[in-house]
Amino acid sequence: MENYSEVRAILERLCGAKGVSGAEDGAANAAAEMLAEYMPVHRSALGSVCGSLEGSGAHILLDAHIDQIGLVVTAIDDDGFLKVAKCGGADIRVLAAAEVTVHGKKDIHGVITSTPPHLASPSDEGKAKAFDEIAIDIGMKKEAALELVSPGDRVAFDGRFLSMLGSRVSSPSIDDRAGV
């Protein structure tokens, strides 16, 4: 890597790959393709990306994880809303109205439901819902949702790879992918 632009392009590609905890193949495949430009690469039985360089010097290990926190579908209710559980370290306090992608039989965009301020009770003001109270609205009735989504499907938080001031960047998956 000779410059910021090259590092940024690699990081943007890694951060753009699918890889919610437990379903990291998209991100692992992207990492393997990029690593293969520099060394022989193989995948372990558990899906880890491994590469090594031959040499006579000291041995070092570079180790990182590649998953992204997200959610996992647990059920589809009678109105077509998806019930979910944490998949990784999802923080309930920041989920209200978040845009998400459900990785079912095809990718489906949705939004995490929230109670509008004019419908919330004064005692609920400023409080996050419990995980068993949140749902994802994918704009489908139950029958249509059941054709595309199943319990166990992963849900990723949408967010773009964002250039910030100077040479800084941000992405929902940057905490894990930057180490790769």
PLM regions with names:
Residues 1-180:
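N-terminal hydrophobic/helix-forming segments and targeting peptides
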